Amino acid sequence: MYIRGSKWNMQKKRRRVNPFGVIVVVLLIGVLIYFDRTVASTIPALFVSTPTPTRAPESFITEAQKLEADGKYAQAIQTYNQAVLADPRNPASYMALARLNIYTNNYAEAIKNAENALMLNNNNDTALALLGWAYGLSGDYIQAESKINQALAINKDNAAAYAYLTEVYVYEMQAGQGVLEILDLAREASRTAVALAPNTLETHRSRGLLLNWTANYEEAVVEFEAAVKINPNIADLHMELGKNYVATLEYDKAIDEYGKAVSLNPNDPTPSTLISRVYFTNGDYAKAIQYAESALALEPSDPVLHGNLGLIFWRNKQYLDAVDQLRLAVRGGTTPEGVAVTGLELDYNRIGEFYQVYGLALAKTNQCGEALQIAQAVATGLRNDDNAQFNAQEVIIMCEALAKAGIADLPTATPFDNQELTQTATVSPTP
């Protein structure tokens, strides 16, 4: 039904489409599409950081190599570590790090980096040789020989491995270890390194160490001079050259080399200690004390450094100062700055010298109660050392003289018999 004129009419009139409106809409859509594709794509999103270009791993390696060539080893190590982060599957970065770790005396880190290289390729003879070298410098001679021999089994022409093996044999001999024919083995390994690569740093270094061990000091000087010429940025090489200059009585040259080691590694007390000993030998005790104190400031908990300073004080007739330092070396204790020092076990060589001079300094300052205990320890513990026996007896003579004069610090001042001395319990240093 259709009701004409009713307001309820269900059929509505259709509006005519405006053609101009359609054109405007189409144009607007086109503009939006153009804006989205050309303009909006260049506008950075809000609150999103601007992306930075990724640096190529090779650029880190190039930079690290330049730093290494300039002797900036700490910075080179840092940059090689960045190279590792950028490309953890490049064994060359790990091996470069291991070598620099060795040059800077960080042997534990060298072992870790050499092992990382081997995780990528367990037949890498260069990494195995470096690992063995690092073990040898750490004092683990069994592992050192094993790893280096593995490297040589893979590559029998690896000259550096023979050089490292020579070094390890020398360290074993210095420690009183190794097989009976170890010196012959060291000589054979050294000759092979020379035959394969006579002009490398590794060959000169290892041969210098071997010649020093066999007391061929002038020849050792030649080898270490050649090594330093190849790489003047390794502190250990300068110290080894300095030691051989001392052996050939070229003290000024020795001090110069030790000074270079100080410059290269200012946080290591060893070169300053070596300088102090040269001045001590020359009788320049003021300079010897200066350098010994500089070394001690770097490692105040080291009993050997306290002993070294104590010996110089003794020779400079500063007896009370000598007692203070040697007591820390022998018995241990706490420095005035509150640093704990652990005493050294009595032994031959330099530690035995600390004990002997400590006893003499105690007697010289009328502290015979303790002096006689130390003399007893020396007489019993160093009975195969004639100088030690003489010094122990000298302590007794000094204290006898004080006792006869009535000024010894003993409860009962009586003469002392050497037989009685040998029956007393040995004194052990207390921590």
What are these regions (language model features)?
Residues 55, 89, 123, 157, ...:
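Structural signature of alpha-solenoid helical repeat junctions
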Residues 57, 91-92, 125-129, 159-160, ...:
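Helix-start (N-cap) detector for alpha-helical repeat units in TPR-like alpha-solenoids
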Residues 1-55, 141, 146-170, 175, ...:
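Long, contiguous interaction/recruitment modules in multidomain scaffold/adaptor proteins
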Residues 86, 120, 154, 196, ...:
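Structural marker of alpha-solenoid helical repeat scaffolds
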Residues 19, 45-48, 335-431:
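Terminal, low-structured helical/coil segments at or just beyond the last alpha-helical repeat
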Residues 53-106, 137, 171-179, 202, ...:
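Alpha-helical segment of the N-proximal tetratricopeptide repeat
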